[in-house]
Amino acid sequence: MTQANNAVYTDISAAQLVEEAIRRGEGELAANGALVVRTGHRTGRSPADRFIVQEPSTEAQIAWGAINRPFPADKFDALWDRVASFNNAQEHFVSHVHVGSAEAHYLPVKMTTATAWQNLFGRQLFINPSAYNPAGKAEWEILNVANFECVPERDGTNSDGCVIINFAAKKVLIAGMRYAGEMKKAMFSVQNFLLPEKDVLPMHCAANIGEEGDVTLFFGLSGTGKTTLSADESRYLIGDDEHGWGEGVVFNIEGGCYAKCIDLSEKNEPVIWKAIQFGTVLENVVLDEQRTPDYSDDSLTQNSRAAYPLEYVEKRSEKNLGGEPNAVIFLTCDLTGVLPPVSILNNEQAAYHFLSGYTALVGSTEMGSGGGIKSTFSTCFGAPFFPRPAGVYAELLIKRINAFGSKVYLVNTGWTGGGYGVGKRFNIPTTRGVIAAIQSGALIGAETEHLPIINLDVPKSVPGVETNLLNPRNTWADKNAYDEAAKGLAKLFIDNFAKFDVSEAIKNAGPQL
């Protein structure tokens, strides 16, 4: 197939995009049919290269700072034109997709990419509607040109790459970035700004539905288990990462999944394993000589990924949405071994732990975080993606929980019996047992034990889970060491929470010294 060197491929199929990616040398086929690509020196998001255009219509509503960095509007216009001109002189790919599955809340997006594989990624992760933009809404544009190199002195960027969101112009500019997760998270940030205006809570969470129509939400940062735990063969998946919660509905913002692949196994993650097939994109996964993926090989990164459409998941919500959640689960990966496998939260505790967003950076998705594992706090369990002040999202969460009567739980997928390096991590079957008990309603009205210092209430028994695991102090050989670790963790919580201006009731719902 011969093409002009500046040919534009518009809305071609996933199979054609795979073919083009191979033809252009962008990737190779794995034995399981997936397209395998490498993203170069950036194998995760680059928070220092993310900006929001500072302009009059939105600047008063954005929480400016290290996460939401301001970018001048005139510099944006100049850089957009420069990148567009560069891209128009080469082959590129255009697809028309939706971001948001609910009719009232979708955004129509024209997605232009310099590479076939990143267009395929967008096609698989966003929503391919049967009819594009039926409501005739104003269109957003993504311009993603991986082979454009920014010049900071000229362009006003931080490095050779950038991600810039312009709300007034409805544009997202991504230049010099081969890691495709930037595109997904940029549009998530856009919806995270827009949805609260409609009284909808945008959430960094996974969601699934039981046979009776009961919905569970799984909040958590990367590596805490959102994708793995929501991919449950006994339930129907809504989505693994980004959702909106409005009156009467939980809807997926996306149309696909972006699963971590490190140490992936068919035994522990059968749903994800089966979804890796022709049309799936594997980022930074190492292949052996027979082109079989070696998911245990982290020589490129711990943050290897699979991007696949929800159609590759057998049990899924056909409409990409469900009702309001019966159970809201905050997943935390506790490195200290202090937190119990499950705690039952009241509304004030829910607000406290939602604002805190405590977890560990495990196989981090961010560049520059290093290979080390460390504790962190990420407001709303996704601080890098929420442009408005945290209180906006916390108030919406409590409003929704109160209105529907959702039950809230804190689930530790991290360490027990000691901290990292001493204790051991909860295995996936144990955590699945906790989740199953929550979803069955077994913990509603359960008899609890109060844990001082960390100020949490734990059930005295959980069906299918060893009772001696429930109070973490019992799992430590040295009880004094546990008490000291608990005080250390409580201090981390208290120091982190000092920045929030909230009621005394919420402040007092957290750990106490």
Curated annotation (Swiss-Prot):
<keyword id="KW-0067">ATP-binding</keyword>
<keyword id="KW-0464">Manganese</keyword>
<feature type="binding site">
    <location>
        <position position="204"/>
    </location>
    <ligand>
        <name>ATP</name>
    </ligand>
</feature>
<feature type="binding site">
    <location>
        <position position="185"/>
    </location>
    <ligand>
        <name>Mn(2+)</name>
    </ligand>
</feature>
<feature type="binding site">
    <location>
        <begin position="220"/>
        <end position="228"/>
    </location>
    <ligand>
        <name>ATP</name>
    </ligand>
</feature>
<dbReference type="InterPro" id="IPR013035">
    <property type="entry name" value="PEP_carboxykinase_C"/>
</dbReference>
<dbReference type="InterPro" id="IPR008210">
    <property type="entry name" value="PEP_carboxykinase_N"/>
</dbReference>
<feature type="binding site">
    <location>
        <position position="305"/>
    </location>
    <ligand>
        <name>substrate</name>
    </ligand>
</feature>
<dbReference type="Pfam" id="PF01293">
    <property type="entry name" value="PEPCK_ATP"/>
</dbReference>
<protein>
    <recommendedName>
        <fullName>Phosphoenolpyruvate carboxykinase (ATP)</fullName>
        <ecNumber>4.1.1.49</ecNumber>
    </recommendedName>
</protein>
<keyword id="KW-0479">Metal-binding</keyword>
<dbReference type="GO" id="GO:0004612">
    <property type="term" value="F:phosphoenolpyruvate carboxykinase (ATP) activity"/>
</dbReference>
<keyword id="KW-0456">Lyase</keyword>
<feature type="binding site">
    <location>
        <position position="305"/>
    </location>
    <ligand>
        <name>ATP</name>
    </ligand>
</feature>
<feature type="binding site">
    <location>
        <position position="45"/>
    </location>
    <ligand>
        <name>substrate</name>
    </ligand>
</feature>
<feature type="binding site">
    <location>
        <position position="431"/>
    </location>
    <ligand>
        <name>ATP</name>
    </ligand>
</feature>
<dbReference type="GO" id="GO:0046872">
    <property type="term" value="F:metal ion binding"/>
</dbReference>
<comment type="similarity">
    <text>Belongs to the phosphoenolpyruvate carboxykinase (ATP) family.</text>
</comment>
<dbReference type="GO" id="GO:0006094">
    <property type="term" value="P:gluconeogenesis"/>
</dbReference>
<keyword id="KW-0312">Gluconeogenesis</keyword>
<feature type="binding site">
    <location>
        <position position="241"/>
    </location>
    <ligand>
        <name>Mn(2+)</name>
    </ligand>
</feature>
<comment type="pathway">
    <text>Carbohydrate biosynthesis; gluconeogenesis.</text>
</comment>
<keyword id="KW-0963">Cytoplasm</keyword>
<feature type="binding site">
    <location>
        <position position="185"/>
    </location>
    <ligand>
        <name>substrate</name>
    </ligand>
</feature>
<dbReference type="GO" id="GO:0005524">
    <property type="term" value="F:ATP binding"/>
</dbReference>
<dbReference type="GO" id="GO:0005829">
    <property type="term" value="C:cytosol"/>
</dbReference>
<dbReference type="InterPro" id="IPR015994">
    <property type="entry name" value="PEPCK_ATP_CS"/>
</dbReference>
<keyword id="KW-0210">Decarboxylase</keyword>
<feature type="binding site">
    <location>
        <position position="204"/>
    </location>
    <ligand>
        <name>Mn(2+)</name>
    </ligand>
</feature>
<feature type="binding site">
    <location>
        <position position="185"/>
    </location>
    <ligand>
        <name>ATP</name>
    </ligand>
</feature>
<keyword id="KW-0547">Nucleotide-binding</keyword>
<comment type="function">
    <text>Involved in the gluconeogenesis. Catalyzes the conversion of oxaloacetate (OAA) to phosphoenolpyruvate (PEP) through direct phosphoryl transfer between the nucleoside triphosphate and OAA.</text>
</comment>
<dbReference type="InterPro" id="IPR001272">
    <property type="entry name" value="PEP_carboxykinase_ATP"/>
</dbReference>
<comment type="subunit">
    <text>Monomer.</text>
</comment>
<feature type="binding site">
    <location>
        <position position="269"/>
    </location>
    <ligand>
        <name>ATP</name>
    </ligand>
</feature>
<feature type="binding site">
    <location>
        <position position="179"/>
    </location>
    <ligand>
        <name>substrate</name>
    </ligand>
</feature>
